[in-house]
């Protein structure tokens, strides 16, 4: 290929920063929408900030800072949440001799899971590490098997928020504690380098 053709190919394949999503070619998540009938899921959340926006740049810098020097306690939190956010709640409940409502939680999550994936695929937000290099920002991602879907909203935080709501109905005295645990879950995903803070905020709104 001649030099002029190479240059032309680069120009032809140039993608606007704001058009970069998690998937190069957006796909629709296949879901039985009858399970969420009556809810206009497209109106649950606003669009995430554009990749070129000052807010996104600010969030990327925040994620970058948090991923540079993680403490052992932070690494442990990341590992626990990455495996199962409910472990945070199990320990809290065990110390107080309280039970986790497993059947109720999973029955509700079977519905919430549809929302989560439909929203993720609909917005197709790129993960922070996909956009950071375009702003000359370094994010040290701790790679696992739990961040291979679009970023917005955070599935882990949807999960932990549901747990907080479910447990608050049973044990209202500990409501603040339950939602604080969900905050820790969201922090863990930022510390891991796989989510924007606004991904977590969106999960709280959608749950």
Could you say what each language-model-derived stretch is?
Residues 184-207:
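Interfacial helix-loop-helix junctions of multi-pass membrane proteins
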Residues 2-192:
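Hydrophobic alpha-helical bundle signature of multipass membrane enzymes
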């Amino acid at each position: 290929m001649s030099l002029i053709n190479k240059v032309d190919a680069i120009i032809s394949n140039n993608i606007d920063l704001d058009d970069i999503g998690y998937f190069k070619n957006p796909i629709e998540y296949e879901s039985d929408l009858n399970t969420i009938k009556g809810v206009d899921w497209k109106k649950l959340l606003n669009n995430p900030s554009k990749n070129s926006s000052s807010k996104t740049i600010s969030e990327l810098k925040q994620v970058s800072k948090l991923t540079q020097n993680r403490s052992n306690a932070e690494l442990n939190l990341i590992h626990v949440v990455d495996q199962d956010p409910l472990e945070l709640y199990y320990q809290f409940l065990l110390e107080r001799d309280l039970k986790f409502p497993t059947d109720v939680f999973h029955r509700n999550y079977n519905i919430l899971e549809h929302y989560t994936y439909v929203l993720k695929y609909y917005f197709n937000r790129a993960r922070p590490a996909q956009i950071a290099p375009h702003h000359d920002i370094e994010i040290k991602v701790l790679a696992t098997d739990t961040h291979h879907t679009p970023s917005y909203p955070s599935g882990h935080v949807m999960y932990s928020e549901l747990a907080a709501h479910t447990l608050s109905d049973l044990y209202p005295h500990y409501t603040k504690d339950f939602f604080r645990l969900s905050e820790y879950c969201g922090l863990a995903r930022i510390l891991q380098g796989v989510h924007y803070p606004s991904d977590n905020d969106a999960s709280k709104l959608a749950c």
